[in-house]
């Protein structure tokens, strides 16, 4: 597998498409709540622990296979992860948890040029998720790709706050943490989102790793704190960006887009859920 990527708009040549096998709601703890359920009470989420319904996993796998087939027919090389049992419990001296899922390869692997960074997730349940991509990454190394991993975070309970989830992220700034989609890649410019999945220590670590390689890392704060930037800012080509008008305004729009043409769209609308409690 060869990696050479600099942005979000170049023609696609290779891709990793995830799988839904063994997907579940993991052990519900402060990291799980911070990652995905910040605006839900824990007593609503806790009973959902366990594997997702079979119909949901089957439908998700059918959709993912359909996507893989479409991409393959378009001449794109598609890689798939190996199934791993997310029900297996693992631990550190401070906590224990089960795993979560393997349908979001883009969350934990950040490609920059021919470098792939394994990112330090804010969620305990995702600390060993990249095992599913090990064979793909070994193939990439054999083809000359440089693979590095950020320091594994300790993720203590005190690393999260839920007293003011509207005013600031639930993730605190105790150690380097970020997901790959906290980063918007614009060639040598990278927009770094401060949110529930990325903090200032994560920003500093990435600056230390990438700035001597010629990259410029631009922090983006007070725009959207619930997770990733892909429902907020999407660069379409050089000089044209798609922006969520319910979050991005003329006042808080990142300066890197100051001279770009902008397309504004209304906020994303949830389509509902068949999961108990309406939890996505």
Segments from the language model and where they lie:
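The feature marks the mature, well-folded catalytic cores of soluble enzymes
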Residues: 1-280
């Amino acid at each position: 597998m060869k990696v050479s990527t600099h942005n979000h708009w170049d023609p696609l040549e290779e891709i990793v498409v995830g799988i839904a096998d063994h997907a579940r709601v993991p052990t519900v703890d402060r990291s799980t709540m911070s990652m995905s359920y910040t605006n839900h009470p824990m007593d609503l989420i806790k009973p959902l622990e366990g594997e997702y319904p079979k119909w949901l996993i089957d439908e998700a796998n059918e959709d993912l296979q359909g996507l893989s087939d479409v991409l393959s027919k378009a001449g794109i090389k598609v890689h798939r992860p190996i199934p791993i049992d997310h029900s297996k419990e693992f631990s550190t001296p401070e906590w224990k948890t089960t795993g979560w899922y393997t349908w979001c390869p883009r969350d934990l692997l950040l490609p920059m040029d021919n470098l792939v960074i394994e990112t330090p997730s804010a969620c305990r349940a995702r600390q060993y998720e990249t095992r599913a991509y090990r064979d793909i990454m070994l193939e990439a190394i054999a083809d000359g790709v440089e693979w590095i991993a950020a320091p594994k975070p300790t993720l203590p309970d005190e690393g999260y706050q839920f007293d003011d989830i509207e005013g600031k992220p639930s993730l605190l700034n105790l150690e380097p943490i970020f997901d790959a989609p906290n980063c918007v890649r614009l060639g040598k410019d990278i927009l770094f989102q401060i949110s529930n999945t990325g903090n200032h220590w994560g920003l500093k670590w990435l600056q230390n790793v990438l700035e001597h390689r010629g990259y410029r890392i631009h922090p983006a704060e007070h725009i959207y704190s619930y997770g990733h930037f892909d429902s907020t800012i999407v660069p379409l080509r050089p000089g044209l960006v798609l922006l969520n008008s319910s979050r991005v305004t003329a006042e808080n729009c990142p300066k890197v887009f100051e001279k770009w043409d902008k397309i504004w769209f209304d906020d994303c609308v949830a389509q509902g859920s068949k999961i108990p409690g309406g939890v996505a």
